[in-house]
């Protein structure tokens, strides 16, 4: 994928860049794999905002993605590479030999006509899925399960991958995109390869309107608010110490710069060998 820059004909196009979509082979999605997507506007079931800066945006359908890859030993042919408005990665439409159709995350290098498969012992080839116990050390993997059978949860965004670093007993050690080194059970599945569309991070929206199309609302700085609205509000001018402040905080008073917020009693903490911010 390449990034396409626009001519600076207007202020909105001066800094804007778009994906070239050159890898897309089909413009209309598979209707049997679509479900309506209702927008929440960042509200929970009580109507209260739980995720700020969300709302509006273009209407979308949700594409049902096969994160579990549990259709074992049934070969599938890649029928199309498609755009998915709900994620940064591209998706691939698979036609299985028994007639079933499924979407998967499209790894880099996957092309229309390729054949892929899932199972305990399948070929080490881009797009194939198998348990970590059968994947060679040093292999780049994505769509990794944290709990066997639950479906992939890690390394799913554009350009993401983890490296299978070691295996010892019932655990495999992975180096994740964040830099975190973490253990997971060897029965957990992962897909071979790197997620495609790696240039996504280089795209510049160029104007506020494109954020609104994506459902992202404006974000007001805490320092620009009043003390009643934010712990960092108040003070005269751009005061960093006025209003009784000492440290930057979230709107709910949690320290925002460097303070660890993970619960130390969480059971999976012992599986993290090295944190993502460790030096």
From Swiss-Prot:
The lineage of its organism: Bacteria, Pseudomonadati, Chlorobiota, Chlorobiia, Chlorobiales. Residues 223-279 are annotated as: Disordered. Part of the 50S ribosomal subunit. Forms a bridge to the 30S subunit in the 70S ribosome. This is Large ribosomal subunit protein uL2. GO terms for molecular function: rRNA binding; structural constituent of ribosome; transferase activity. It comes from the Bacteria. Belongs to the universal ribosomal protein uL2 family. Keywords: Ribonucleoprotein, Ribosomal protein, RNA-binding, rRNA-binding. One of the primary rRNA binding proteins. Required for association of the 30S and 50S subunits to form the 70S ribosome, for tRNA binding and peptide bond formation. It has been suggested to have peptidyltransferase activity; this is somewhat controversial. Makes several contacts with the 16S rRNA in the 70S ribosome. Residues 259-279 have a biased composition (Basic residues). Residues 232-242 have a biased composition (Gly residues). GO terms for biological process: cytoplasmic translation. One of its GO terms (cellular component) is large ribosomal subunit. SMART domains: Ribosomal_L2, Ribosomal_L2_C.
């Amino acid at each position: 994928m390449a990034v396409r820059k626009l001519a600076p004909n207007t202020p909105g196009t001066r800094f804007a860049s778009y994906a070239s979509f050159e890898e897309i082979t089909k413009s209309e999605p598979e209707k049997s794999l679509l479900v309506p997507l209702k927008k929440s506007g960042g509200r929970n079931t009580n109507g209260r905002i739980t995720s700020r800066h969300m709302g509006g945006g273009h209407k979308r359908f949700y594409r049902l993605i096969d994160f579990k890859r549990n259709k074992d030993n049934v070969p599938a042919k890649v029928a199309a590479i498609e755009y998915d408005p709900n994620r940064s990665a591209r998706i691939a439409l698979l036609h299985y030999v028994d007639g079933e159709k499924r979407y998967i995350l499209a790894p880099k290098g996957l092309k229309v006509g390729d054949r892929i498969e899932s199972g305990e012992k399948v070929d080490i080839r881009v797009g194939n899925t198998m348990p970590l116990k059968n994947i060679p050390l040093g292999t780049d993997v994505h769509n990794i399960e944290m709990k066997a059978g639950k479906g992939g949860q890690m390394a799913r965004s554009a350009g993401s991958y983890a490296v299978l670093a070691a295996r010892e007993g019932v655990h495999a050690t992975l180096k994740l995109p964040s830099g975190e080194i973490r253990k997971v059970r060897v029965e957990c599945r992962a897909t071979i390869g790197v997620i495609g569309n790696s240039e996504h991070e280089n795209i510049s929206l160029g104007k506020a309107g494109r954020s609104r199309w994506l459902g992202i609302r404006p974000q007001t700085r805490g320092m620009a608010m009043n003390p009643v609205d934010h712990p960092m509000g108040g003070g005269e001018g751009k005061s960093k110490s006025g209003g009784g402040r000492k440290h930057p905080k979230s709107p709910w008073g949690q320290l925002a710069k460097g303070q660890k917020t993970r619960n130390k009693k969480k059971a999976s903490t012992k599986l993290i060998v090295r944190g993502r911010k460790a030096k």
